[in-house]
Amino acid sequence: MAKLAALHKRLGLEAALLEEAELGMSDHPLCEEAMQLVSIGDDVFGRPQQLAPDAARAWAGMLEAATSQGISLQLVSGFRGIDYQAELIGRKLSAGQCLSDILKVSAAPGFSEHHTGNAVDVTTEGAAALDETFDNTDCFHWLLARAGDFGFALTYPRDNSFGIDYEPWHWCFQSQERSRAR
């Protein structure tokens, strides 16, 4: 926790954010880094990506089902460590973005579902990555109807309780129990 507190301090995040999460008083739960990761191939930018084993199996099943139904489901990102999350926020701060605006689109280090190895950001052929217009695609509508079959859920719908902007591209594997994938 000391490392996380130091990262938060360096980025100018309030100490209360961590304190409230530790006490269970925050809408934002702390997300521990995955202990085990497996490769799931490259993302749309050619970068190797990883997920936790159960999420990786569910992702593979969902990707296969989408492809078999003519849906182009493409990976934008998977696992992101706490240090990498801090780098992302640091780059945005260096570019002059306001911290409060950054935190509407990027979770603070320690709070991103990507740390768990269970979250994916996705896109589809012809759509811009990480763009709200993804919700106008056949891929998004397929995910709404079928992602739950594989244990994935849309974490940040419009007006979500986390205060994160709408992210139709962000899906998180919830559990094997929720998954009907084989």
What spans do the regions from the language model cover?
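Extracytoplasmic cell-surface/polysaccharide-interacting catalytic and binding patches
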Residues: 1-78, 83-182
